[in-house]
């Protein structure tokens, strides 16, 4: 039986881990998870995720700051007989060292955020495109953020009481959104969308919650990962491509 091949970056923790878990629970799914350290990821439980019949987890090394690693990962996949990708989820990201106003920003930190959150997904797409092209109904998903919406920026800034929102992270995700639109426009066979995964109970989300005086983030990583997978299932070129959605399917203005 044919498998559905899903590539997820940053699969060792957070929503990437939950997405890998969700897809592995489905029969006949090959889940390729990228991690910085394969041995560490296996020892931390990623290798112990239960897999449905015909499903398998394959780990590849991608250091997000390395723009060469995605191409090497694809070489490794092809050597293992994985020559087609049905879904690629660009998930790996960082928030930066601290949330500050633009006037107080650290240029090196900003450049690093952009490199990992926007440039690395470009390198990932360049590397995986030939494998996506071999799929009958290929899909590319950029894990974005609510703070990437330029249309909603002023309202969000007001809702946060005028506190800094982390301009580096927001700018990097807005750049990722623009990349997603370009991928959509340039590849008529692909279904391409950006998805805000929600305010999740991850390491990054918990730090953000404390910053804004919250006890914890409002959303469950496991529940929202299941919602994202449902959204990806429903996505078609005609209905979803070239658009930005919340995890539960509401369209977000760019």
Language model segments and positions:
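Conserved glycine-rich Rossmann-like NAD(P)H-binding loop of the short-chain dehydrogenase/reductase
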Residues: 24-43
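Catalytic loop of short-chain dehydrogenase/reductase
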Residues: 93-122, 129, 133-185
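C-terminal helical subdomain
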Residues: 189-190, 194, 202, 206-254
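A glycine-rich helix->loop->beta "capping" turn
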Residues: 53-58, 76-88, 96
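Rossmann-fold scaffold of SDR-type NAD(P)-dependent oxidoreductases
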Residues: 9, 84-93, 117, 142-144, ...
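Rossmann-fold cofactor-recognition segment
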Residues: 49-68
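Conserved Rossmann-fold cofactor-binding substructure of NAD(P)-dependent oxidoreductases
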Residues: 63-83
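N-terminal Rossmann NAD(P)H-binding glycine-rich loop of SDR-like oxidoreductase domains
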Residues: 9-12, 16-24
């Amino acid at each position: 039986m044919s498998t559905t091949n899903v590539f997820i970056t940053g699969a060792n923790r957070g929503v990437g881990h939950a997405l890998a878990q969700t897809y592995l629970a489905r029969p006949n799914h090959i889940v390729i998870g990228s991690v910085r350290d394969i041995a560490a990821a296996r020892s931390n439980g990623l290798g112990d995720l239960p897999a449905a019949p015909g499903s398998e987890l394959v780990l590849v090394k991608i250091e997000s700051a390395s723009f060469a690693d995605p191409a090497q990962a694809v070489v490794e996949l092809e050597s293992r007989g994985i020559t087609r990708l049905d879904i690629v989820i660009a998930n790996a990201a960082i928030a930066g060292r601290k949330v500050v106003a633009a006037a107080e920003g650290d240029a090196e930190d900003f450049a690093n955020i952009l490199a990992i959150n926007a440039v690395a997904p470009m390198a990932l797409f360049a590397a995986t495109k030939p494998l996506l092209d071999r799929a009958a109904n290929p899909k590319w998903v950029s894990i974005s953020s609510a703070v990437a919406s330029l249309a909603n920026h002023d309202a969000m800034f007001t809702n946060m009481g005028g506190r800094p929102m982390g301009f580096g992270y927001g700018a990097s995700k807005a750049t990722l959104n623009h990349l997603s639109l370009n991928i959509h426009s340039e590849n008529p066979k692909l279904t391409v969308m950006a998805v805000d995964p929600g305010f999740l109970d991850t390491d990054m989300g918990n730090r953000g919650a404390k910053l804004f005086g919250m006890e914890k983030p409002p959303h469950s990583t496991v529940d929202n990962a299941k919602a994202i997978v449902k959204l990806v299932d429903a996505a078609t070129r005609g209905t979803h491509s070239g658009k930005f959605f919340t995890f539960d399917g509401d369209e977000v203005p760019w």
